[in-house]
Amino acid sequence: MIIGYTYVEECIMLAILYLIIAIFFGTQLVRFLIPDIRRLYVGVAVDQQTLPKVPTALFLLPAGTLVGLLLTTFVTYFLSYVIHPFVPADTPTLLPSDIIAMCIFTYLGCLLWQRCFVRDYRKVKAQGPSKLGPFKKDVNTVIFYVTSVILVLSAVCFVYCYTCYMRGNNIRLGFSIFSDFAPHVAITSGFGVGSNFPTQYPHFSGDNIQYHFMFYFLTGNMEALGLPLVWAINLPSILCMLSTLTLLGTLAVLLSGRRAAYLLAPVLFLFRSAWNVFHQASELKALPGSTWSYVFKTITKQAVWYGYTIRDEWGIWAINVYANQRHFALGIGLVLILIFLFLPHFRRMFLHLSRIDGFKDCAKRFFISKEAWLPRENDPLHPIGSLILAGMIVLAMPFFHGSCLISALLVLFGMAIFSEFRLGYLGVAIVSVLSSVLQARFFAGGASNVASFKYYFGFVIPEIEGKNTAGLGSAIGYTGTVISYLNKMGFLTVIIPCVLFFGLLAYEIWFKKNLYRPILLIPFSFPLIFAFYCQVSLEVLANHKFIQVSFILFDIFIAGFLANLLALPIGIKERVEASGEKTQSGSIVLPKKAFIPTQIGSAIVCLFLLFGLTATGISEWCIYYNLNTHKSGYVELHTDSLVADWVVKNTNEDDIFLTPMWSTDDFFLSGRRVYYGWPYFAWSAGHDTETRQINYQWLLTGANGNVDEFRRYCNEMGIKYVIHSSDYYGTGETKDFYNPEFFAANLTEVARFDNGIVIYKV
């Protein structure tokens, strides 16, 4: 029997139907709250000529997908929380709430569609077709976007499916992800097969949950609705990553005016920039008798992360991080949507300041004008609708990805400084903080259990270790050390935005253009700065997500820069003169003899920069491929495990087990929780593993041989079963404490298996 698939044949399509309904609802909600996406594009784009290059669907579909999955999952969870005590034992726990949720969101989606249809019909009848430039559906443009989506989708599918896949009845998890993936599998099965309400951390039962688990409720729900565990995890991951990369590329096109940026932005996202491969190549070439062929072969065949900066050997900056942390892509996508929604207000401030003469009038406009704080009257952008959508996103976001929510607030704070409609930003911040506090209290017992903001300088830079509480004056003295670290770790992703900031700022000032693009780089850097000055969780290394968010946002500008280098926005003098057209301010024209070599030289520079930006990423894809080879680079979970099968059939969905300190084990496919699993996961999530380990070791002794005390404590913690396994003898934390004779003599044996595992009932 395959665990959790007892009713697959009857309801596997329910999972697909749920996703379709979620996406349908999300797209209709976005359409309803943002009535004119072309107008939103106008508020974001560098110029009007960019609009025909960008289809409306490139925002509507990915934003609708992410918003739909976010909100339907959020509502389904709380429906399940309320309903689960009343669900009959022979009915899957999530099925009733899923049916109710699908009915609700189908109705809401249809209602919103009908409202949008009537509104658009009346608008066209009263005002005629929109005067904004529609998408120009020429063959080359359509082919470009379709090809780009296919290429990006192929890359995304490879990243996710290469390290999480099925072979027969076995789930295979690649070597580079299986450890961190262990709690994700356990949480997914906890909802898909078990009943994890009130929700607790599966490797640390009895202490609420402090981990942002909501994405894995979605994957668990997919398993509950019939998808095999692998596809329950992979399918939502693919949808979220594809949507995020689509939004990233779309924003790059709008800000650069170059269509090629749509593909370049995802490429930069997937293949990171760093010094690693260049440093490694120089080391290899310096070896006696080394050749470039040897260097190339060594780099492409290696199966270990190259450790140039601290924790590079864990692959935390590599493509592996997205395979490991499946919820990260969703969080990044939501950050991008929030930027889209507020960027028009940011752009408007600079647009109107450029039309005002005199410092006094500019200061008045910037600080105390009505538009600086309140929405404009009869604004075609419909800012209230955008504000409602942003509020709904941050309301649901805290336990989907807390770090991305903090990153979003940091970016929005930076944008608000230079923006109109600042009270809108404030409203979003208030909703996010209130929602975070309430959810933290509900899930974790208090906000301090989830995040505690304190000053901590230097991230994980070894040279600053031990001096992380140094004052601001001392911290400034380490500026060179921080810059050196960023240069090694980010290379051109750090250098190019700095050059672009000053270069683009000078260009916009010289030609009297809107300054919003170079200034936007400032709020984009706020998560990066935050990562070096603040500690949010017990593990400072977790701040790497803030740095990655900033780097991803920088990629938007870098992609636009490369796209402009690839095809310079310059005209041919003879052609312009022959047409009789006037050149726009800031436009450059060259004689044909100069145009061709200039264009060729620019394209060559672009290709060299692209190589420098992606070389380390390409080498890390090679490592990812070699480390997780399908011949031997995996850990297997057996869906036909007799132990897990017995547990599913003979225990309650919310029963807790005393087990070895398991990390990745077949047992977790049963959806049951353990008292104390591998402690790193729980520790990094903020749980008190030190006290729990003392109590755990005491339990392994049989409460020092006191059966009454043992039963009392087990009853207090909800422990119903004890599993005997030789795995107790594999770690120093358990081998000297485990007393198998106590359990055999005092507890009732309920199951014994050929692999030596025995299950006792407390």
Where in this protein do the model-derived segments appear?
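Extracytoplasmic
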Residues: 570-762
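Active-site lumenal/periplasmic loops and adjacent helix-entry segments of GT-C-fold
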Residues: 141-142, 152-334, 354, 630-634, ...
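Hydrophobic, aromatic-rich transmembrane alpha-helices
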Residues: 337-348, 407-417, 490-517, 564
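Membrane-embedded, hydrophobic transmembrane alpha-helices
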Residues: 1-137
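Hydrophobic alpha-helical membrane-interfacial segments at the cytosolic entry of transmembrane helices
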Residues: 143-152, 264-268, 420-443, 607-612
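Hydrophobic/aromatic-rich transmembrane helices and adjacent perimembrane loops
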Residues: 238-241, 328, 406-412, 539-574
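Membrane-interface alpha helices of multi-pass inner-membrane proteins
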Residues: 319-324, 370, 375-378, 386-401, ...
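Membrane-interface helix-loop-helix junctions at transmembrane boundaries of multi-pass membrane enzymes
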Residues: 127-131, 135-138, 348-385, 417-427, ...
